[in-house]
């Protein structure tokens, strides 16, 4: 969003630009923009999305320069470990020391961490996760906008409030409405990355969805993620050719039997094959599972993290199960906040270097302090809902969603204030 800074193009070679943020070099694909050394750009997800005038870039960089390094100092102090960050639990201390050295945790070690009950030890795990986040990713925090274009869905998932059996009022935004909402997010609030989300077989044909993506790419400088469920390999290719470069598709559980029980008529293998095909096609992958899903064990949760990593996820998306009154799982409890933080921090410990970990809206719905606690437990990504208010409450996947009645402006102000207070800075998602 507006939490972005321009980069200087230092070199362009075979469609890949070397770009510099205050002297720190990264690389980004430049397939959408023709570049020369000396140009200034905005990049997201490892893609250059916009070339900007030097005067505009230099003005922004001047405003950011001192702030950029001050934020890093704030974050480094808050993420540092000290002499109090030790445990009398010798096995835990050994596991955390191994994690700090970059040694991959075994499944048994991961299960031990998830089974911790002592509050001090739980806090120590979270602080270690935050330390590793800072060591590998510095203070970068990515912010995406999410635009929910339709709540129509043919799936009948046992936990979802917009499943085909739900009595929720259905909507499908028109192309003009989508363009207007995206235009406000991009032009007024400076978003550089948008997730387009809907139910599966959401009232648009694949051709119509591809036209939406192409229309947005032709008009706006933005990285587009799609989240339309399983649309098939042909559909993925059509969306990619239209300009989408990211896919948000969660598998929810790595347990095949539990998956089939909760997703009637569907198989986990189909989901995984879809994600693998998207990665091979060039998509940035965002995936993960539900925490506290009825019937899931700690063993399943560890397998969820392992599977997410094996799918080459650019971003891990793990959120709590939240019961919806109109679903088969209405009477099951949500997990505790500690359960959620335990999984987020374990994901950081297990995948410290590559994981970008999202603080989901579901977690924000579970806890008003989700962003703060999640970002201090290894998380480094948030989302802002840019869906028009008249539709937002109808995307009722679980009750009383966070930010359901907030304007985009209100959400942006809150997000910026919170990120700056934690010393988090803007980032390009690519490596």
Regions found by a protein language model. Give the residues of each.
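Core AdoMet radical
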Residues: 163-179, 185-207, 212-275, 284-291, ...
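Glycine-rich, proline-tolerant flexible connector loops at the mouths of alpha/beta enzymes
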Residues: 146-147, 194-206, 257-259, 320-332, ...
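Structural motif
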Residues: 39-40
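Catalytic cores of alpha/beta
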Residues: 232-239, 294-308, 365-376
């Amino acid at each position: 969003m507006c939490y972005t800074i321009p980069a200087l193009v230092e070199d362009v070679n075979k469609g890949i630009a070397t770009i510099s943020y205050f002297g720190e070099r990264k690389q980004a694909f430049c397939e959408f923009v023709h570049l020369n050394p000396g140009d200034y750009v905005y990049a997201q997800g490892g893609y250059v999305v916009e070339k900007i005038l030097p005067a505009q870039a230099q003005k922004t960089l001047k405003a950011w320069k001192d702030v950029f390094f001050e934020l890093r100092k704030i974050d480094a102090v808050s993420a540092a470990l000290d002499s109090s960050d030790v445990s009398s639990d010798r096995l835990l201390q050994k596991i955390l020391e191994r994690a700090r050295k970059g040694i991959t945790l075994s499944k048994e070690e991961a299960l031990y961490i998830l089974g911790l009950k002592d509050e001090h030890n739980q806090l120590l795990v979270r602080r270690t996760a935050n330390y590793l986040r800072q060591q590998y990713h510095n203070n970068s925090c990515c912010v995406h906008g999410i635009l929910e274009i339709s709540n129509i869905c043919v799936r009948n998932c046992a936990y979802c409030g917009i499943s085909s059996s739900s009595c929720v009022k259905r909507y499908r935004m028109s192309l003009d409405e989508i363009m207007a909402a995206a235009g406000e997010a991009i032009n007024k609030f400076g978003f550089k990355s948008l997730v387009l989300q809907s139910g599966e077989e959401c009232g648009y044909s694949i051709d119509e969805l591809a036209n939406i993506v192409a229309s947005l790419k032709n008009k706006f400088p933005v990285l587009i993620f799609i989240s339309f469920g399983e649309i098939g390999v042909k559909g993925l290719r059509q969306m990619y050719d239209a300009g989408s470069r990211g896919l948000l598709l969660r598998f929810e559980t790595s347990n095949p039997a539990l998956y089939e029980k909760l997703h009637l008529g569907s198989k986990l293998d189909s989901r995984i094959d879809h994600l693998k095909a998207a990665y091979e096609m060039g998509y940035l992958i965002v995936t993960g599972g539900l925490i506290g899903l009825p019937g899931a064990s700690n063993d399943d949760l560890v397998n969820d993290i392992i599977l997410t990593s094996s799918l080459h996820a650019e971003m891990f998306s793990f959120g709590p199960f939240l019961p919806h009154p109109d679903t088969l799982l209405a009477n099951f409890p949500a997990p505790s906040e500690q359960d959620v933080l335990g999984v987020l921090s374990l994901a950081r410990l297990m995948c410290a270097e590559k994981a970008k970990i999202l603080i989901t809206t579901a977690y924000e719905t579970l806890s008003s302090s989700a962003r703060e606690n999640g970002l201090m437990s290894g998380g480094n990504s948030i989302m802002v809902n840019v869906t028009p208010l008249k539709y937002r409450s109808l995307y009722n996947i679980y009750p009383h969603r966070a930010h359901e009645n907030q304007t985009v402006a209100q959400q942006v102000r809150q997000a910026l204030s919170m990120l700056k207070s934690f010393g988090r800075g803007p980032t390009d998602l690519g490596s």
